[in-house]
A protein has these predicted regions:
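Metallocofactor- and cofactor-centric catalytic cores in central/energy metabolism, strongly enriched
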Residues: 1-125
Length: 125
């Protein structure tokens, strides 16, 4: 592929989570995404933000500052569980560049069972 006319960009990936789930669920899903991407395309144009936003504007500001400091030109908001909430949409609003939201597919096996059980406890079903 001729890449002469393609811009060089750096994509920042920020995971988000709901507070009714363990943060590690989104973090582990983000790591799996990053592993799959870097295995196929390398590490040159992608950055894994170490801050996971857990329904907090404080986390959002920290993540925004982190991806800016890392020199990211584009943003991927990785929904580790459930859809966008206030903090994630504010992150997209305040990031000056292209951005997109992507969502994790639900795993099978024990991880999916754990998620269902935790969410039922959260809802007190």
């Amino acid at each position: 592929m001729n890449k002469e006319n393609m811009p060089e960009i750096k994509i920042g990936v920020v995971a988000v989570s709901r507070d009714c789930f363990p943060e590690s669920l989104s973090v582990n899903r983000r790591k799996a995404l990053m592993d799959a991407y870097t295995k196929k395309y390398g590490k040159d144009h992608i950055y894994e933000c170490p801050i996971c936003i857990v329904e907090s504007e404080i986390h959002m500001v920290q993540a925004l500052e982190d991806v800016k400091a890392a020199g990211c030109d584009a943003l991927v908001v990785y929904l580790g569980n459930f859809g966008p909430e206030i903090a994630e949409t504010l992150l997209a609003k305040h990031f000056d560049g292209p951005k997109m939201f992507i969502a994790a597919a639900e795993e099978s096996g024990s991880a999916a069972s754990d998620c269902t059980r935790l969410y039922q406890q959260y809802l007190r079903v």
